[in-house]
Swiss-Prot record:
It comes from the Bacteria. It comes from Ralstonia nicotianae (strain ATCC BAA-1114 / GMI1000). The gene is purM. The lineage of its organism: Bacteria, Pseudomonadati, Pseudomonadota, Betaproteobacteria, Burkholderiales. It catalyses: 2-formamido-N(1)-(5-O-phospho-beta-D-ribosyl)acetamidine + ATP = 5-amino-1-(5-phospho-beta-D-ribosyl)imidazole + ADP + phosphate + H(+). This is Phosphoribosylformylglycinamidine cyclo-ligase. HAMAP family: AIRS.
Length: 353
């Protein structure tokens, strides 16, 4: 409907989907833009291409007793910063990382990924940038971007905003599922460095920014502060799958919402406690800034942010040196940050001292 056209005149000529706010041509243009990104993620097992009603994937015959492991997640309020900063190149990797790192914890190899992109009005350039990041995340994880959904829903979202959700499916041999049941006193807790705040705690990050009003373009340890804040979530899949093939990994924990103190207990058996030593690694500059700018207590930091540790790996004391060497050779920064001991009455299952 033109600016001079009345609603009744528009109705008399016949309404279209575009009149309702849905641009089919824009959706088609987006599909054409993202096909090359998805194609680069193809791997063994993918049957067919983008555009079918369902996405097909054949489980490799290398698995004798495959168990499917699935995970779904979003990016949370980190998206609000993406909108404010008009930078959409990192949140796609965030989306993939949140799900593939979760299923990795149980020993699963990520096989394929699907995404959901919802907006009020589709901006092809923005959506293509986001989905390119999703595809790049899939490449890092070794999984195929096998399908997805783009939903343009007028009046559902403010102008310039969108929401993301993702879904990963992986497989693990039934006898190789990592469930934490073999964790015992004397085992060693290794911490793999995070790339930043990943995709958790951003409601607090945004509040700290609101209160402290920093210059997000200011230099921050060799980069802009906004670059440190928006750094994409690290994907640990390939180094850890290789480690699992090399030696017995007893347990892993993806450090997401709830931080170290709430995520590590999720993989521990009854009767043991993980004792983590905060002097075993240096709190990265971003978290030092967040704590100082927001006057955030230590306990709050540990239950909101990853504090520089994005993944926990638990191995026997005998296997710890080999595990550390392997992970370092794979390009990971790894710290020996704690140990497993008997749990005392009334004690939390993870303590930071």
């Amino acid at each position: 409907m033109s600016a001079s056209e009345t609603p009744s005149a528009s109705a008399s000529r016949g309404l279209s989907y575009r009149d309702a706010g849905v641009d089919i041509e824009a959706g088609d243009a987006l599909v054409d833009r993202i096909k090359p990104f998805a194609k680069r993620t193809l791997r063994e097992g993918v049957l067919g291409g983008i555009g079918g009603f369902g996405a097909l994937f054949e489980i490799s015959k290398k698995y004798q007793e495959p168990v499917l492991v699935s995970g779904t997640d979003g990016v949370g309020t980190k998206l609000k910063l993406a909108f404010a900063l008009n930078r959409h190149d990192t949140v796609g990797q965030d989306l993939v990382a949140m799900s593939v790192n979760d299923i990795l914890v149980q020993g699963a190899e990520p096989l394929f990924f699907l995404d959901y992109f919802a907006c009020g009005k589709l901006d092809v350039d923005t959506a293509a940038t986001v989905i390119k990041g999703i595809a790049q995340g899939c490449e890092l994880a070794g999984c195929a971007l096998i399908g997805g959904e783009t939903a343009e829903m007028p009046s559902m979202y403010p102008a310039g905003e969108y929401d993301l959700a993702g879904f990963a499916v992986g497989a693990v041999e039934k006898r190789k599922i990592i469930d934490g049941t073999t964790i015992a006193c004397g085992d060693v807790v290794l911490g793999l460095a995070s790339s930043g705040a990943h995709s958790n705690g951003y409601s607090l990050v945004r509040k700290i920014i609101e209160v402290s009003r920093p210059d997000l373009n200011a230099d921050f340890h060799g980069q802009r502060l906004q670059d440190a804040i928006m750094a994409p979530t690290r994907i640990y899949v390939k180094p850890l799958l290789a480690l699992i093939d090399k030696l017995p990994v007893k347990g892993m924990a993806h450090i997401t919402g709830g931080g170290l103190v709430e995520n590590v207990p999720r993989v521990l058996p009854e009767g043991v406690t993980a004792v983590l030593h905060q002097d075993a690694w240096t709190l990265p500059p971003l978290f030092q800034w967040l704590q100082k700018a927001g006057n955030v207590a230590d306990d709050e930091m540990h239950r909101v942010f990853n504090c520089g540790i994005g993944m926990i790996v638990i191995v026997s004391a005998a296997d710890a040196p080999a595990a550390i060497a392997h992970l370092k050779d794979a390009g990971e920064t790894v710290y020996q940050i704690g140990e497993i001991r008997a749990r005392q009455p009334g004690e939390a299952q993870t303590i930071v001292i």
